[in-house]
Amino acid sequence: MGVTCVSQIPVAEGKSVQQTVELLTRKLEMLGAEKQGTFCVDCETYHTAASTLGSQGQTGKLMYVMHNSEYPLSCFALFENGPCLIADTNFDVLMVKLKGFFQSAKASKIETRGTRYQYCDFLVKVGTVTMGPSARGISVEVEYGPCVVASDCWSLLLEFLQSFLGSHTPGAPAVFGNRHDAVYGPADTMVQYMELFNKIRKQQQVPVAGIR
């Protein structure tokens, strides 16, 4: 894999989530991007079981268990303000056995799914973010394949993002700053998705200026 930028795109004014996704994919196809199947990233939140908390008033920690269709044999466990553990797919079974320590938060599952596009050295994924039956937002992931160091290719990623996102082009992800000259890996992408999902969970239903 290369270096990836994950961002949330606002819903276009007067349009639905699905209509905005169609606008974005149409722009990609006009650039010459070709469809390359589908993708899905999901996330379920677990919190520390009450029985494991010592003193009264002590707050529990959160853990996010995530899957990415690009890595079908792996499961990612991201601890709140902590490391990312990459395990095999049986990790979900282990979480059931650890229910005395971590409990699944009610109605916490959130996911994004959509279409993959290939454009030259860029892999683009435009997804609809859902919680339960409701569409909550739009995710865009862009990967630049030939490079594995974020600082070496951010300018190229930015230029490509601007070509179809315009004024909604995101800034450099926080994870880039933390790993300026380090080799980029799958865990860095999952951290970006975790941050995007948490942002969408917290968002209030207020109007925003979207894509035109």
Curated annotation (Swiss-Prot):
Its main location: nucleus. It comes from the Eukaryota. The gene is MED20. The keyword Hydrolase does not apply. Keywords: Activator, Nucleus, Transcription, Transcription regulation. The keyword Cell membrane does not apply. GO terms for molecular function: transcription coactivator activity. InterPro entries: Mediator_Med20. One of its GO terms (biological process) is regulation of transcription by RNA polymerase II. GO terms for cellular component: mediator complex. The lineage of its organism: Eukaryota, Metazoa, Chordata, Craniata, Vertebrata. It comes from Macaca fascicularis (Crab-eating macaque). Transmembrane segments: none annotated. Belongs to the Mediator complex subunit 20 family. Signal peptide: none annotated. PANTHER family: MEDIATOR OF RNA POLYMERASE II TRANSCRIPTION SUBUNIT 20, UBIQUITIN SPECIFIC PROTEASE HOMOLOG 49. Component of the Mediator complex, which is composed of MED1, MED4, MED6, MED7, MED8, MED9, MED10, MED11, MED12, MED13, MED13L, MED14, MED15, MED16, MED17, MED18, MED19, MED20, MED21, MED22, MED23, MED24, MED25, MED26, MED27, MED29, MED30, MED31, CCNC, CDK8 and CDC2L6/CDK11. The MED12, MED13, CCNC and CDK8 subunits form a distinct module termed the CDK8 module. Mediator containing the CDK8 module is less active than Mediator lacking this module in supporting transcriptional activation. This is Mediator of RNA polymerase II transcription subunit 20.
